[in-house]
Amino acid sequence: MSRSIKKGPFADASLLKKIEAQEGSEKKQVIKTWSRRSTIFPSFVGFTIAVYDGRKHVPVYITEDMVGHKLGEFVPTRTFRGHKVADKATTTVGK
């Protein structure tokens, strides 16, 4: 279920404060955040935001196509390492 229209989009206040502080400066640094639930606003375009995946901060460069999505959508929290491969020596050929 999506968020109610009357509530509007959500973005963490500390993240908005960090974005506003860097808008005036020429050198844009990577902004660290733990807020995966924040919606990407048009003012975020052009910034690199390091989103926490539960283990480390993963840098994400924000483009126009990402506006309206959540930050957590672009950083997976689980890594799939594949299914276990059966050992050929232990399998029986038949009886």
Curated annotation (Swiss-Prot):
GO cellular component, one term: small ribosomal subunit
Protein name: Small ribosomal subunit protein uS19
A molecular function GO annotation: structural constituent of ribosome
Family: Belongs to the universal ribosomal protein uS19 family.
Record-level GO BP terms: ribosomal small subunit assembly; translation
Keyword tags: Ribonucleoprotein, Ribosomal protein, RNA-binding, rRNA-binding
InterPro entries named in the record: Ribosomal_uS19, Ribosomal_uS19_bac-type, Ribosomal_uS19_CS, Ribosomal_uS19_SF
Top-level taxon of the source organism: Bacteria
Keyword rRNA-binding attributed: yes
PANTHER family found in the cross-reference section: RIBOSOMAL PROTEIN S19P FAMILY MEMBER, SMALL RIBOSOMAL SUBUNIT PROTEIN US19M
Gene that this sequence comes from: rpsS
One of the Pfam families matching this protein, by short name: Ribosomal_S19
Stretches of the chain forming a coiled coil according to its record: none
Function: Protein S19 forms a complex with S13 that binds strongly to the 16S ribosomal RNA.
